[in-house]
């Protein structure tokens, strides 16, 4: 058994959120121990099973700055200026995310980011133990047992408090549920995803525009590609589970080849190993996790995907989890006891987590159905015009979520108002030439207060 120090926390999961939290708290003087069920990715390679690239936004970068990790991480990131939309017929068109290159997002490979944060966590003083799968927790006695799956050997510890940063399939959440039900609910989409890869050119470099997120929208399904710093693209097909086409009708490499030849013809030559990768990579599930509570007084707390997993369509899962880490560190600074800190953390983050979960689902519909829709494109034009005229009041949804650190719940509420304005103002119009700008000014000033941080 390991003795427990007065300011010690035990983290379950050495993924992205676990490592960042370990850095933040170690630098504040906490004794941090992290237990990870997998092996050390620096020795045996990354085995997460998910290589969906991550979109790093201002929220995530702010958290990295607080941990002194931004410079190391950004050296591995690739700038994305916007969505490059590939229609079935016609040339690809870039839809910028922001006004200029000061408003971009960054693509980074999950494995590279995890390894960088793991190094920094250990440098900050955190102790990380690999091959430790959480097996049993006695919350009353402060006792936990881990199993090394290589030899089935148990490892037992005493703890002051457990923090679950172990993802959507959280073992700590399951243990907490057995102690006291958390009201867990998971709503799965009727779509799944499959990951593939676009290799670099023979001499290096990208085969398609490297500073964009590429989307092939096809109504009920879509294909996306995010750049890596080595010239590759991590590409993901989102497809229904049933119907035509679907994973039920695309069962092998030959059927996948036929699907791409029909629906993504310009992408087909970019993926030489399509058939092989299709058969090697299993489909992944997509779901939204909600809980009635995230903590057991001061004995255990869930953060990130372990508390509020979301679908990946707003690129905010990691950014939200990183915000969790900073918020938790701040609450631990502000409170003398863990129970109060955990309760304050949950109170501060619950509404925002629910808001971004909702916005992520809505963004899926936008990405697959609307990015090539004329009405949507006209609304985007008007959105840009309104921002240019009243930049502190009419702040685009994407700007609030991605380039600012506006609370997600506030961004959601303002976005709903702004969507109503855009839909009503463009109804019956094919362009912006006949809009009543004086009336729009009155509406914008009446319905939207100036937003902190907007400029």
Swiss-Prot record:
It comes from the Bacteria. GO terms for biological process: anthranilate metabolic process; kynurenine metabolic process; L-tryptophan catabolic process; NAD biosynthetic process; quinolinate biosynthetic process. Its EC number is 1.14.13.9. Its cofactor is FAD. Pathway: Cofactor biosynthesis; NAD(+) biosynthesis; quinolinate from L-kynurenine: step 1/3. It is an enzyme of class 1 (oxidoreductase). Keywords: FAD, Flavoprotein, Monooxygenase, NADP, Oxidoreductase, Pyridine nucleotide biosynthesis. It catalyses: L-kynurenine + NADPH + O2 + H(+) = 3-hydroxy-L-kynurenine + NADP(+) + H2O. GO terms for molecular function: FAD binding; kynurenine 3-monooxygenase activity. PANTHER family: KYNURENINE 3-MONOOXYGENASE. Catalyzes the hydroxylation of L-kynurenine (L-Kyn) to form 3-hydroxy-L-kynurenine (L-3OHKyn). Required for synthesis of quinolinic acid. Belongs to the aromatic-ring hydroxylase family. KMO subfamily. This is Kynurenine 3-monooxygenase. It comes from Xanthomonas oryzae pv. oryzae (strain KACC10331 / KXO85). The lineage of its organism: Bacteria, Pseudomonadati, Pseudomonadota, Gammaproteobacteria, Lysobacterales. The gene is kmo.
